[in-house]
Amino acid sequence: MNIANARVLVTGGSSGIGRATALALAEAGARVAICGRNRAAVEQAAGEIGGTPFVADVSDEASVVKLIPDVVRTLGGYDVLINNAGFGRFAPLIDTTADDMRAVWETNVLGATLVARESARHFIAQSSGNIINVSSTSGARGSANGSAYSSSKFALTSLTECWRAELRKHNIRVMQINPSEVLTDFAYRARGTERVTDPSKLLGSDIADAIIAMLAQNDRAMVTEMTVWATNPQ
C-alpha cells in the first residue's frame, strides 16, 4: 500500500512501540490517530508526532464503538489499524491472581478484539483495510512468571489467524508482528525493573521499521507474520 496519506489508528500510541510506530508512519506521510486512556499522555504524544489524539479504553465496548467512527470522521477515512495497546503483569503461578488474569486479558485479548471488530466493520464496507496485531515472542513460547501475559499473546495469535481467515475475502490484510524484548517503559513497569541503556536490545523504532515494511507491500501481497529478535542481546 501507499503509506503516504494512509489513514491510520495506533492504539496505545502514547508511548513505547505504539508511539514509535505512530511517529514513523507520520514521517512517511500517513495521517495518524493515536488513542490511549491517559489524556495528558495521548495529547502530548500526538502533539509531538503531528497526530490526532483520542482518549479511549480499548477494553470498554462503548468507548471503542464511539472511537472508530470518530477516527473515520476526523481523518476523512480509515485504512490501517495498528492493534498495539497492551498490558502486562508477571508473577509465579502460585502468586497469580484472578485480577492479574482479568486485567491482562481485558486489554490484550478483549480490547484487541473490540477494536478489530469495529475496524473490520468499516473495512468490509469499503472492501479494503489492514490490521496489524502487535503480539510478542512470548506468544510463541511461554516463560516462567508469564501465565497472564504469555497466554494472552498466544490467544492473540489465534485471533489473528481467525480474523485473517474471515477477512481476506474482503481484501483486508490481517498481519501480526512479534517483538522480542524491547526497551520501553511498558517492559520496565511490567517487570518492576529499573530502566537501563543497552545498545544490544531492540528499540521501539526497530519494530516500527518492521511494521512499515509489512504495510509497504503491494496490496496483493501480505506478510502474515513477522518476528523481530535482537541480534545479540547481552
Each model region followed by its residue ranges:
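Conserved glycine-rich cofactor-binding loop
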Residues: 14-15
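Active-site helix of classical SDR
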Residues: 116, 152
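Conserved glycine-rich Rossmann-like NAD(P)H-binding loop of the short-chain dehydrogenase/reductase
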Residues: 30-43
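The beta1-alpha1 cofactor-binding region of Rossmann-like NAD(H)/NADP(H)-dependent oxidoreductases
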Residues: 56-67, 98
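C-terminal helical subdomain
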Residues: 169, 176-177, 194-234
